[in-house]
Regions:
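Glycine-rich anion/phosphate-binding loops
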Residues: 2-5, 52-61, 224
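Gly/Thr-rich phosphate-binding beta-strand-loop-beta motif of the actin/hexokinase/Hsp70
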Residues: 1, 128-150
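Short, well-ordered amphipathic alpha-helical segments that serve as non-catalytic structural scaffolds
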Residues: 2-13, 113
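Glycine-rich phosphate-binding loop plus the immediately following alpha-helix
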Residues: 59-67, 78, 93, 98-127, ...
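Short acidic/polar capping segments at secondary-structure boundaries
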Residues: 81-86, 136-139
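Phosphate/pyrophosphate-binding loops at sites that engage ATP/ADP/AMP, CoA/4′-phosphopantetheine
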Residues: 8-21, 120-124
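Short beta-strand-loop/turn "lid" adjacent to the catalytic site in phosphate-handling enzymes
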Residues: 13-57, 75, 83-95
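Adenine-nucleotide phosphate-binding core of ATP-dependent small-molecule kinases
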Residues: 189-227
Length: 227
């Protein structure tokens, strides 16, 4: 379905497939990676189809790119995938030895924004020390220096967002899960796509919330300010 939509857009824009020399897609939830470009191959496609780190639309990027590129005999790539993990080891440590923090986040967007800032200010990206925030269905906050995403507060740890529940009180979360009757998969779906603004206001579009506030909705203002 998504591939067909892409092909239709290319047709509308008069892009000739035989003139393409390569295709670049968003990287999905692969095992931890260093930042940069990776060529899509059969192993990557299999991993994303069968053993992704978690379910997410970004897993489709490399799969679709490969499906378009192969018949044309051109390479497909991903760049700065979701699982770029260049965090300093000390920052991965938590209060439970069985659990560690992971460098999963909106790396493509935040690294691109950091590089754009560096260019606009006549600096080398590797010489900058920046805090970059991604605002979308989830919110992630990155610390970037030395040319790496050195630390990240991802959409599981930080503020709630239009769709994500964000960081939650751990003891209360455990109690709630035990009493909810939900499976682990159902609970994760609730936290990932039915939390935040969706949970409180029933919408995932901040522009709609802003209209509610303009119309005098005090509860909407409270929730928006909390986010």
């Amino acid at each position: 379905f998504r591939k067909d939509m892409i092909m239709e857009v290319l047709k509308e824009k008069n892009v000739k497939l035989e003139e393409l020399t390569g295709i670049v897609a968003r990287g999905g939830l692969l095992p931890p990676l260093q930042a940069g470009a990776y060529r899509v191959n059969d192993d990557m496609v299999w991993q994303l189809k069968n053993k992704p780190a978690m379910e997410h639309a970004s897993n489709l990027g490399a799969i679709i790119a490969d499906a378009i590129a192969k018949p044309l005999g051109i390479p497909a790539f991903i760049y700065d995938g979701v699982t770029v993990d260049e965090m300093m080891p000390i920052l991965k440590i938590t209060g439970l030895k069985e659990l560690s923090r992971k460098g999963i986040g909106h790396n493509l967007n935040t690294r691109a924004a950091a590089m754009k800032y560096a260019r606009e200010h006549g600096k080398e990206y590797k010489d900058c020390k920046l805090i970059v925030v991604h605002l979308g269905g989830g919110i992630s906050i990155t610390l970037q220096y030395g040319g790496k995403v050195a630390d990240i507060i991802n959409d599981e740890d930080g503020p709630f967002a239009p769709e994500r529940a964000g960081g939650l009180p751990s003891q209360d979360l455990i109690k709630y899960f035990g009493q909810s009757g939900m499976t682990a998969k159902e609970m994760l779906k609730k936290m990932k796509s039915r939390g935040g603004l969706v949970a409180h206001l029933g919408v995932n579009d901040s522009r709609e919330v802003e209209k509610m506030i303009e119309n005098g909705d005090e509860h909407a203002k409270l929730i928006y300010d909390a986010m």
